Each structure stands twice: as structure tokens, then as C-alpha cells.
Regions:
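Conserved N-terminal entry element of GNAT/NAT acetyltransferase domains
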Residues: 1-3
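Enriched for short, Lys/Arg-rich terminal
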Residues: 6-23, 27, 40, 46-47, ...
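Low-complexity, intrinsically disordered/propeptide-like segments
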Residues: 31-32, 49
């Protein structure tokens, strides 16, 4: 998997402020590799301007927003709800 610059900033924030979120993100990414489009975090295909992207819950407030192309998972955000 790879992280966009924005998603890498989100992950760096969690590494500094909440390691449980980092663990959850890692678990979600492992599950995406194994089970996409099903699995943990209530996977949801996004619509409209975010077409082609998927979302999974990190917690009530925060979402992991990503795409899957061939065998590559690209993470676009992992903080807040569907981006800023």
C-alpha cells in the first residue's frame, strides 16, 4: 500500500497522538488486502466526486479513505470523515 502526502501527514499525526488509531489503520489495511471489498470497518464505496474511492471506519469520527487498483491500495486520508 502507499499513502498520498496528505494521508502520510494524517498517519504521522496519529503516530504522535494516538497509537491505537495507528494499530486500527494497520488492521484495516491488512483486511483490505485480504478481503476487499468486504471486511471490517463497514466498507463503503463512495459516490459522486469521490467515485472510485472506498471508506472504512477507523472510529465514529475518522475514516480510512482509499482506492484499490490491481494489487495496490492507495490511502488518501485516515483522519476526519471523508477528507477536509
Amino acid at each position: 500500500h502507499r499513502f498520498t502526502e496528505s494521508a502520510a501527514e494524517d498517519l504521522a499525526y496519529w503516530k504522535k497522538h494516538d497509537l491505537k488509531k495507528v494499530e486500527r489503520i494497520k488492521a484495516l489495511l491488512d483486511d483490505i488486502k485480504a478481503n476487499h471489498p468486504r471486511g471490517i470497518g463497514k466498507p463503503e464505496q463512495l459516490r459522486h466526486q469521490k467515485s472510485g474511492l472506498w471508506s472504512r471506519r477507523i472510529d465514529r469520527e475518522h475514516r480510512l479513505v482509499y482506492s484499490v487498483e490491481e494489487n495496490t491500495v492507495t490511502v488518501y486520508a485516515c483522519r476526519y470523515h471523508y477528507g477536509r
